[in-house]
Design a protein with these regions (language model features):
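Residue(s) in the substrate-gating loop at a strand-loop-helix junction
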Residues: 140
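Active-site helix of classical SDR
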Residues: 120, 156, 164
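Alpha-helical segment proximal to the catalytic Tyr-Lys
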Residues: 125, 169-170, 245
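Conserved glycine-rich cofactor-binding loop
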Residues: 8, 15-16
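Substrate-binding pocket helix/loop in short-chain dehydrogenase/reductase
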Residues: 95-97, 101-109, 217
Length: 287
């Protein structure tokens, strides 16, 4: 029996990148999936590619009525809701605090935090009646470690992680599990957009992001290869499945080790300099 046989999932931001790959994995494992995005042409084409197990609904997740309609669509089309994956995102350029644009901040929060709460709200109403369900929010290592990403994005992701824990404490008694995934540097169009590429070009050429990430992996990441969308999709599969039935309130970090510390290979030159400096400062040391 396939892992998600008979289950129904809604995945926001699923017309490209992590969301699209997760939809493919879920369908392959037996789920019915609602594809969610703003680009109708791309979404309809992707749903057709996945076949009868998929349906597309155009949604702006920053609009609460759209989020409700998205959940209603899943229930009307497939009869139930077993998993909501809050994955939609928007690019956010780095800005220094003194030049902060509060309108831009609000726009980022609307997608990365407010939409997460809206999704939880309407998914929980359905799942509570069923007595079971899994809500997954795609957060980021920027939500647990400062300095890697923009302030707006990082703050919203940090809040989404804590919202996940709060929701887990409330919804557990209703049989609903709530967890988050914090990806590291993953080769996606979203990453390429953050690096300044145009949206269409970025979505169609994730290999550009992979090349950029490859240039810093040796210094930043203990695992010496580039994270890919399938790494996150497989993590989502675990959290959506019954294999994670005893997991809730957890932020599952999938980042190649970036957030764990500083790679030994990267730190070695500084460590050697540190010891040479100590030796040179000792009394009687010969230059």
């Amino acid at each position: 029996m396939r892992t998600l046989e008979g289950k129904v999932a809604v995945i926001t931001g699923s017309t490209s990148g992590i969301g699209a790959r997760t939809a493919e994995v879920f369908v392959a494992e037996g789920a019915k999936v609602v594809i969610v995005g703003r680009r109708e042409d791309r979404g309809e084409a992707f749903a057709r590619k996945l076949g009868d197990a998929a349906s597309f609904v155009r949604t702006d997740v920053s609009v609460e009525a759209d989020v409700k309609a998205m959940i209603d669509h899943a229930v009307d089309r497939f009869g139930r809701l077993d998993c909501l994956m809050n994955n939609a995102g928007r690019s956010s350029q780095y800005a220094v605090i003194a030049d902060a644009d509060l309108e831009q901040f609000d726009a980022v929060v609307a997608v990365h935090l407010r939409a997460v709460l809206a999704g939880m709200k309407y998914a929980a109403r359905v799942m509570a009646v069923q007595g079971t369900g899994s809500i997954i929010t795609v957060a980021s290592i920027n939500g647990i470690r400062a300095g890697l990403g923009g302030h707006y994005y990082s703050a919203a992701k940090a809040a989404s992680i804590h919202l996940t824990r709060c929701a887990a404490m409330e919804l557990g008694e209703k049989g609903i599990r709530v967890n988050s995934i914090s990806p590291g540097m993953i080769a996606t169009g979203a990453f390429a957009k953050y690096m300044g590429m145009q949206p269409d070009e970025a979505d169609d050429h994730p290999e550009y992001a992979e090349a950029a990430i490859s240039s810093v992996v040796p210094r930043w990441q203990p695992l010496q290869y580039v994270g890919r969308v399938d790494d996150i999709a497989q993590t989502a599969l675990f959290l959506a499945s019954d294999a994670s039935r005893f997991v809730t309130g957890h932020n599952l970090v999938v980042d190649g080790g970036i957030s764990a510390g500083w790679p030994i290979a990267a730190a070695r030159p500084d460590r050697e300099l540190f010891f040479r400096t100590i030796q040179a400062s000792r009394p009687g040391h010969a230059a």
